[in-house]
UniProtKB/Swiss-Prot annotation:
InterPro entries: Metallo-B-lactamas (IPR001279), RibonucZ/Hydroxyglut_hydro (IPR036866), UPF0173 (IPR022877), UPF0173_UPF0282_UlaG_hydrolase (IPR050114)
Organism: Roseiflexus castenholzii (strain DSM 13941 / HLO8)
Gene3D superfamilies on file: Ribonuclease Z/Hydroxyacylglutathione hydrolase-like (3.60.15.10)
Domain of life: Bacteria
Keywords: Hydrolase
Protein name listed in UniProt: UPF0173 metal-dependent hydrolase Rcas_3617
Keyword check for Repeat: no
Length: 244
């Protein structure tokens, strides 16, 4: 497996959830689907609680990205970062305002030593709360700048958009997390074109293989990158695996 070499450890917990240990030793989670996640290893279900979290970044409101957020908010005392609509809902559920950082696309905040800029994605964002469909604002991604200057971009659940070229031009991310599963998000061909626009050194595919309907594979992504002439190292993690 390739190494990143940026004093950052990235662990895939399956589907769209990632655990990141930053160069400064902070522990962050991107999206919060752990307990009900059928591919998240039991070890990680325990570790995110026992080791604690400094911050949780939420991309949107679908159950497979926030189902465990209230439990993890209680268990870890993490600062929760997301679109203002999501953090307002969390406040209504009893999460303290001092632990919520709500903002919107184009905005930048600093949490746990990380400078995070919220970016555009194209998807949808609702949550079913006690049988009621609750709007959760709009879907988003994040550009994350680590303490040592390492830049990562998590696209969120999305189709390919030309905005990705702007993100590549402005922030020059070295590593991109992006979905490849098809049906609800990009397929491998669209994801490869997204990488052509962004031009990172590394790509970590996600949001595939959780259910049979999410058919895209990392090998298909590599094939499409080759077809588009994209020079990128695709890091193919299995749920529970890490790369540094």
């Amino acid at each position: 497996m390739a190494t990143i070499g940026r004093d950052t450890t990235i662990s895939w917990l399956g589907h769209g959830t990632f655990h990141i240990q930053t160069p400064g030793g902070k522990k962050i989670l991107i999206d919060a689907w752990v307990d009900g996640n059928p591919v998240c290893p039991d070890e990680w279900k325990q570790r995110v609680r026992s080791e604690g979290l400094d911050a949780i970044f939420l991309t949107h409101g679908h159950f497979d990205h926030i189902a465990d957020i209230l439990d993890l908010a209680t268990a870890t005392n993490a600062t929760i970062v997301g679109q203002f609509d999501i953090t307002s809902w969390l406040a209504s559920k009893g999460v303290g305002q001092d632990r919520l950082v709500g903002f919107n696309k184009g905005g930048t905040v600093e949490v746990a030593g990380i400078r995070a800029t919220m970016t555009h994605a194209t998807h949808s964002s609702t949550f079913t709360d006690n049988g009621i469909i609750v709007p959760m604002g709009t879907e988003a991604g994040y550009v994350l700048r680590m303490e040592n200057g390492f830049v990562m971009y998590h696209t969120g659940d999305t189709a390919v958009t030309m905005d990705m070229q702007i993100i590549g031009d402005l922030y020059r991310p070295e590593l991109v997390f992006l979905p490849i599963g098809d049906h609800f998000t990009m397929d491998p061909m669209q994801a490869a074109y997204a990488l052509k626009l962004i031009r990172p050194k590394f790509a970590i595919p996600e949001h595939y293989g959780t259910f049979p309907i999410l058919r895209g594979t990392p090998d298909q992504l590599r094939e499409q990158c080759s077809a588009f002439g994209v020079d990128v190292t695709v890091i193919d993690l299995k749920p529970g695996e890490s790369v540094s």
